Structure formats: C-alpha cells, structure tokens
From Swiss-Prot:
CDD domains, alphabetized: ABC_PstB_phosphate_transporter
Segments forming domain ABC transporter: 5-248
Any GO molecular function: ATP binding
Membrane topology category: Peripheral membrane protein
Keywords recorded for this protein, A-Z: ATP-binding, Cell membrane, Membrane, Nucleotide-binding, Phosphate transport, Translocase, Transport
Cellular component, GO, one term: plasma membrane
Entry protein name: Phosphate import ATP-binding protein PstB
Single GO biological process annotation from the record: phosphate ion transmembrane transport
Function: Part of the ABC transporter complex PstSACB involved in phosphate import. Responsible for energy coupling to the transport system.
Lineage of source species: Bacteria, Bacillati, Actinomycetota, Actinomycetes, Streptosporangiales
EC number: 7.3.2.1
Family: Belongs to the ABC transporter superfamily. Phosphate importer (TC 3.A.1.7) family.
Protein's organism: Thermobifida fusca (strain YX)
InterPro entries to which the protein is assigned, alphabetical: AAA+_ATPase, ABC_transporter-like_ATP-bd, ABC_transporter-like_CS, P-loop_NTPase, PstB-like
Catalyzed reaction equations: phosphate(out) + ATP + H2O = ADP + 2 phosphate(in) + H(+)
C-alpha cells in the first residue's frame, strides 16, 4: 500500500561537510515525483535519506525528520533494514545478483532476511513480481537461467521485480534508465506509469524530457554555490515547473542556460 512521505528541515552531512541543506517537501502516495538538477546538487544524496541508504557511507548523518505515514524513519527504535524493506531502491545500473537465477533474484530479499518460503509461496511471489515488472512473459520459460544473462533493460526490470517482491510502499529510483538504450528506457517509463497505481515513486533523472513524461511532481535541486550544499529550489506540479516555474533559477535550468 502506497504511503505518503513528509520531509521537514532535513540536513545531510558527510562528516563536517554539509551536503544538502534544509529540505522540506511532501511526496504524495500513488504518484511519481522526479528530482532534477545538475550533477553534484544533492538530489541522489537526498533520495538515499528517504530509506537510510546514505548510512552505508561512513560519517554520513542527517538532521531533521522523514515521516512515512507519520512514522519517523529515524526514530531510535526503528530498524534501518525494515525501513529499506518498506522503501525499496532501484539503482542507476542494473545489479541482479550474478550467480543467482532469475527466480532466486526475485526472492533474494526473503532469503537475505532468513525468511523461509514454501515452494508454492515462492512461485506465487516470483510470478506476481515479474508480472508487476512487465517481465513474466519474456522469462517464464527460463527462470533457472542467471539473472545476468538478460539484456540490460530486462535486468533493470528484474531489479524492479526484486524490489517489489517484498511488497514495499515506496520505490526510489536513482537514474534507472541512464545505462539503458532508448527502447529499454521506454519500457521502464511505461512500467513506472503502471507502478504508481500501487506505489509511491520517487525518481532521480538527468533527463528533463523523462521527468516531463513520467512524473506528476518535479523538484529542482541546485548548489547554493561552489563548495556549498545542495538545496531544494522549487517543487510543484510537473507541467507548471516546465512551463511556468516560479523561480528564475528553475527557469534557467529548464531552458538550458546552465546545468
């Protein structure tokens, strides 16, 4: 079931360095929110704070709040592993487990958490997840083949199937199409439009045309200056951001004057 994300006053630090400063936003359920901005502006760093993935980097910490349907994901009694089950992540490059079959890749989340599945239960999860990622018809007769044997676009859809297999509420996607060809990119974009019926989706993209095509809401990030932190400049309905932004900085980026 899709959930709402409320972020208030979020600062992200790496050691003493302030990487992202004072971000507040609401991300509505069953919608696609795109983060755009030039390289190094903090959009991917901020994305990782939404499921605590930034914590795998030594010295990373946050100040502020991230609420998932009113539950503070940074509360002392909250397990980061549970947060990452609830808020899944799809990375820039397809990363199926190379030694695992397509079948085992899909249920990897259950195995990593030492959850035993009956064969019938595992079969149901695999088919449901692969259908959800629009991949079932292409691989149903070769589920025992390595995940790495698939094409790049298929591998990325396999990674999406793996993410939705554990039934998250939110899917984070960090430039999921940047390593893919145009046909595979179109397949992923079509899939995103379908997935938003059941999930809250947040996507980082360098491709403004992609943001315009797939998202309902767009957030523009930019650096406050050389050596300064990234900041949220403007967030709003995608059509408005691309046709009538409120901030001059946003307009300059959208029209290609910088970035």
């Amino acid at each position: 079931m899709a959930k709402r994300i409320d972020v208030s006053g979020l600062h992200v630090y790496y050691g003493d360095f302030l990487a992202v400063e004072d971000v507040s936003m609401t991300i509505e359920p069953r919608s696609v929110t795109a983060f755009i901005g030039s390289s190094g502006c903090g959009k991917s760093t901020f994305l990782r704070t939404l499921n605590r993935m930034h914590e795998v980097t030594p010295g990373a910490r946050v100040e502020g709040k991230v609420l998932l349907d009113d539950q503070d994901i940074y509360a002392p009694d909250v397990d980061p592993v549970e947060v990452r089950r609830e808020v899944g992540m799809v990375f820039q490059r397809p990363n199926p487990f190379p030694t695992m079959s397509i079948y085992d890749n899909v249920i990897a989340g259950y195995k990593l958490n030492n959850r035993r599945l009956r064969k019938s239960e595992a079969d149901e999860i695999v088919e449901r997840s692969l259908r959800g990622a629009n991949l079932w018809e292409e691989v149903k007769d070769r589920l025992d083949r390595p995940g790495a044997s698939l094409s790049g676009g298929q591998q990325q859809r396999l990674c999406i199937a793996r993410a939705i297999a554990v039934e998250p509420s939110v899917l984070l996607m960090d430039e999921p199409c940047s390593a893919l060809d145009p046909i595979s990119t179109l397949a992923i974009e079509d899939l995103i439009s379908q997935l938003k019926e059941n999930y809250t989706i947040v996507i980082v993209t360098h491709n403004m045309q992609q943001a315009a095509r797939v998202s309902d809401v767009t957030a523009f990030f930019n650096l406050a200056g050389t050596g300064k932190p990234g900041k949220l400049i403007e967030i709003g309905e995608t059509n408005k951001i691309f046709t009538k932004p409120e901030k001059k900085e946003t307009e300059n980026y959208i029209t290609g004057r910088f970035g």
